[in-house]
Regions:
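Active-site helical microenvironments for divalent-metal-assisted chemistry
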Residues: 1-121
């Protein structure tokens, strides 16, 4: 679990972004992938971080592209998602994990569309 969030945080740090954005990158999947709750994060981190993490936590009942559109107004969430997409789009990583070409193509298209949504006016 920890490698992907660390890589996202490193991408953000390499861009010399602010501390809140880097921390949100580190925590972006924690509510989705662990037992940690948003309420627990709110006790330990500033509102800018927890608001971004809340937005980045994908409610599976919400269409993926609607979820991505909902990130756009929050600058931190938008930057973190772009870094997340960049790391998730690493085809070498996908191939090393044993993913099929079909799955890689699906992800490439999905992440490309998500990036277009985030970068559109």
């Amino acid at each position: 679990y920890i490698i992907h969030p660390l890589c996202v945080a490193i991408i953000l740090a390499d861009l010399e972004l602010d501390k809140e954005t880097i921390v949100a990158g580190l925590l972006h999947d924690v509510v989705e992938d662990t037992e940690v709750t948003l309420a627990e994060l709110e006790q330990a981190f500033p509102p800018a971080v927890t608001e971004a993490v809340c937005l980045l936590t994908h409610d599976k009942s919400v269409d993926y592209y609607d979820y991505v559109r909902n990130l756009k107004p929050n600058v931190i969430a938008k930057k973190v998602k772009l870094a997340d997409l960049a790391h998730n789009s690493d085809e070498i990583r996908s191939k090393a994990a044993g993913c099929s070409e079909k799955q890689i193509l699906h992800w490439r298209e999905k992440y490309s569309r998500a990036k277009e949504i985030l970068l559109s006016e």
